[in-house]
Amino acid sequence: MFPRPVLNSRAQAILLPQPPNMLDHRQWPPRLASFPFTKTGMLSRATSVLAGLTAHLWDLGGGAGRRTSKAQRVHPQPSHQRQPPPPQHPGPYQERIWVGGEGWGEVGGLRLSKVGRRDREVGRGLRAPAGRGRAMGGMPRMGTVGDFGQALSSLAWTSTCFQDFCLPSLPGKLPAPLISKQQFLSNSSRSLFN
């Protein structure tokens, strides 16, 4: 597959692939031509590596139909080079979204790419542009299962939902504020925590 060097009486000859004639398809693989060198001291290991890369590029189809310059033509033979492995294209990335709660329940939302939640918030994701994820204040829009699952995992939305919808307020009385560390508890409620 690779050209082999031929020793001449004058100097070392290097075989490099030539561009194929586009009209004559019987000359595939490409013809090999020899170039005599009068000074063999110019050859070094770096130029042999470059020749190997040139031969690899030609084998991969990089030189078909193109003319090579003089700098690319005058290179020594390739030294023990391996052909690079073919590129591996990963398949589509699928991930199931799990929402914790009473037991583990599976929400069947499939995401087809590695786009994080932050990318969706700034408008680079697949779901919606920025600002469309929440329709009514803090409530998520019910368009897709994935958005609803992400809204359930948001602590800010669950606390506002719990205060607004789950705590009944008596007529004429506001609901009691949440207990913080600065508020003092009565004696009866202190005994519950001690």
Curated annotation (Swiss-Prot):
Chief place of localization: cytoplasm
UniProt keywords, alphabetically: Cytoplasm
Tissue expr: Expressed most abundantly in the brain at protein level. Present in cortex, cerebellum and midbrain. Found in neurons. Elevated expressions detected in Alzheimer brain samples. Also expressed in testis.
Keyword set includes ATP-binding: no
GO cellular component, one term: cytoplasm
Location relative to the cell: Cytoplasm
Region (Disordered), start-end ranges: 62-93
Protein name in UniProt: Uncharacterized protein C20orf203
